[in-house]
Amino acid sequence: MRIAEIKRTTAETDIALKLNLDGKGVSVVSTGCGFLDHMLTLFSKHGRFDLELTCKGDTYVDDHHTVEDVGIALGQAFSQALGDKKGICRYGDTTLAMDESLILTAVDISGRACLGYALQIPTQKVGTFDTELTEEFFLGFVRNANLTLHIRQLAGSNSHHIIEGTFKSFGRSMKKAVAIDAAFANEIPSTKGVL
């Protein structure tokens, strides 16, 4: 079973997370940031990952620490659940339409943390959510999952649609990348022999 449990406590956040890579897309998410909860529920559904996540953060300041630290914890969970990465497809990409927005994400579970982020979100907020925190979430994730993620906005004018399309596309790309490839069932998918 490719399952991880993460408990992460700092002076700013207290996070408990359980992730099943081979799930059915069932999630229970409570971070204190409603928009982030919505995005993670979409990610779980489209990636078919089971996700249980609670975060108690200093949202009386703002949502920055919560969003960043949830990204960190989710990245740690993927790293833990993937183990030695034997048999994974390694790569995944998805171009996804969300009304007028069109988002491409591409993943390489390479063991190297790299984020290529090219969203042009037109507003500073969606409801109470600071849209600049979208990038902070993904930075926290890639640095702790040790993978490469490229995000490209090919079209879009509605901030909510752009971010929602990104999380849906990201979920589907991660689903492809972590899937087991029968051709590599007992191998690391790299000529180096390690990821």
Regions found by a protein language model. Name each.
Residues 1-195:
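Structural preference for solvent-exposed beta-strand-turn elements
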